[in-house]
């Protein structure tokens, strides 16, 4: 990583001021005693997990969640000492490393629960875990019938401390709220059974980004914002949207220019055929950097604050755009693929729309060849 983006033809700029702003927006929906567990899985949705977590910690966040063991270990090795919850599936062979790095697992099956119980016996204090209830996502988790009896067993006493109970909402951003309401009803029934046993759970959490805005009754004691931290939402048009600011901009530089005649072709298989003399700018970014090949012949980039359409097939390392109507363009000219340039902007949700996906995939797909440049909050 370098602090001088002019030395890099292609880079992602991460605006930590926007990140802090988005966190403030999220907190406006919460009661004062409701905590935030920041979701920084998938390299913080492509933004860089270590720097993003460190920036959020400076903003007072004390709880983080990742998808996998290796993501949690990376944060520990970077010096993050606060709570790190591993949301994804765990395997028996991973338990020693999990315990060694003081990572908090979300447990979804009885076998891993047994293994954790044995591993935690050598731990000097009760080892915290969260339990996941499957309420309608059809993915990880104990069924309600499986979970409640566990609290009557010795399995959840002694070396383990059940610190949290969670579920994952499948349709919090859907137009119909009935799916979320059914899931919440199932979850609350399990929670009630546990509390009737006199068991206190410090952290109860169900709310993802969309639920934070739409369903205040899902907040409980902890919420799990992900995409909203990074400046995007998937709320229906009928729901007032928060004032979020996209955090990541993707930029590159014109590396070569050429004029092709009418009938000339661009890129593999000659799929673009010029209908007039056409000025082509070559950009040093491609699908190996996470700029999808599905963007071939669709979408645009910004040069001089104007849209230049992508022409031909996106290559592994290069993209070509038509700059005929943006004279004069020069080698070394700044190009914005995601972000704002002048009065015009292209954000990840628009790029996602061009290729039939979601902003999450666009952001997470930006590869390791693209350096991240951090603008301090």
PLM regions and their residue ranges:
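Active-site anion/phosphate-binding pocket segments in diverse small-molecule metabolic enzymes
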Residues: 2-20, 24, 28, 70-71, ...
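Active-site-proximal beta-alpha core segment in soluble small-molecule metabolic enzymes
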Residues: 5-13, 20-21, 28, 32-205
């Amino acid at each position: 990583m370098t602090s001088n983006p002019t030395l890099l033809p292609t880079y992602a700029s991460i605006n930590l001021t926007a990140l802090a702003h988005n966190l403030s927006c999220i907190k406006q929906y919460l009661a004062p005693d409701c905590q935030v567990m920041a979701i920084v899985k998938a390299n913080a949705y492509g933004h860089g997990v270590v720097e993003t977590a460190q920036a959020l910690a400076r903003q007072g966040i004390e709880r983080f969640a990742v998808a996998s063991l290796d993501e949690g270990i990376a944060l520990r090795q970077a010096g993050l000492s606060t709570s790190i919850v591993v949301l994804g599936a765990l395997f028996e062979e991973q338990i020693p490393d999990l315990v060694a790095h003081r990572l908090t697992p979300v447990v979804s099956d009885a076998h891993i629960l047994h293994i954790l119980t044995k591993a935690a016996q050598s731990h000097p204090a009760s080892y915290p875990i969260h339990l996941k209830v499957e309420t309608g996502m059809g993915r990880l988790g104990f069924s309600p019938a499986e979970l409640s009896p566990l609290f009557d067993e010795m399995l959840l006493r002694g070396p383990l401390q059940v610190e949290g109970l969670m579920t994952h909402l499948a349709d919090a951003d859907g137009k119909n709220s009935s799916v979320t309401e059914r899931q919440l009803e199932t979850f609350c029934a399990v929670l009630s059974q546990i509390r009737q046993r006199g068991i206190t759970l410090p952290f109860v959490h169900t709310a993802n980004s969309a639920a934070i805005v739409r369903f205040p009754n899902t907040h409980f004691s902890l919420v799990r914002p992900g995409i909203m931290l990074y400046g995007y939402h998937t709320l229906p048009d009928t729901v007032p949207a928060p004032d979020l600011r996209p955090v990541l901009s993707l930029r590159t530089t014109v590396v070569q220019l050429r004029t092709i005649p009418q009938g000339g072709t661009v890129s593999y298989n000659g799929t673009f055929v010029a209908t007039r003399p056409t000025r082509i700018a070559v950009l040093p970014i491609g699908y190996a950097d996470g700029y999808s090949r599905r963007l071939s012949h669709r979408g645009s980039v910004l040069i001089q604050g104007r849209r230049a359409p992508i022409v031909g097939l996106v290559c592994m390392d290069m993209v070509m755009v038509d700059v005929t109507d943006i004279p004069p363009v020069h080698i070394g000219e700044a190009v914005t693929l995601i972000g704002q340039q002048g009065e015009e902007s292209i954000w990840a949700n628009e790029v996602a729309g061009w290729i039939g996906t979601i902003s999450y995939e666009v952001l997470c797909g930006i590869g390791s060849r693209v350096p991240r440049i951090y603008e301090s909050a």
